[in-house]
From Swiss-Prot:
Pfam name, any one: Ribosomal_S10
Family designation: Belongs to the universal ribosomal protein uS10 family.
Biological classification of the source: Bacteria, Pseudomonadati, Pseudomonadota, Alphaproteobacteria, Hyphomicrobiales
Quaternary structure, from the entry: Part of the 30S ribosomal subunit.
Protein name per the record: Small ribosomal subunit protein uS10
Gene name in the database record: rpsJ
Length: 102
């Protein structure tokens, strides 16, 4: 697979799970002989939701909630067939969303 790159985008709400997953991917790729660029942290997406505290009155009394989506990008340069097989067999944490582009 010469001249080809694999780009892996990881998303998670918890940054600790995300970091452990990126470390697993990097160690697996390096063990099989591929060159890894990253992990590159992307900007955290913060979604804020504002709701009324009471169900009926008191419009001025509100509460805010937020969801933070943390993202990382990894580039695997010139992956070997063993690298692709190892990445397919890799079992990551449940809260991590993985997008792979060849």
């Amino acid at each position: 697979m010469n001249g080809q790159n694999i780009r892996i985008r990881l998303k998670a709400f918890d940054h600790r799970i995300l970091d452990t997953s990126t470390k697993e991917i990097v160690s697996t790729a390096k063990r099989t002989g591929a060159h890894v660029r990253g992990p590159i942290p992307l900007p955290t997406k913060i979604e804020k939701f504002t709701v009324n505290r009471s169900p009926h009155v008191d419009k001025k009394s509100r509460e805010q909630f937020e969801i933070r989506t943390h993202k990382r990008v990894l580039d695997i340069v010139d992956p070997t067939p063993q690298t692709v097989d190892a990445l397919m067999k890799l079992d990551l944490a449940a809260g991590v969303d993985v997008e792979i582009k060849l």
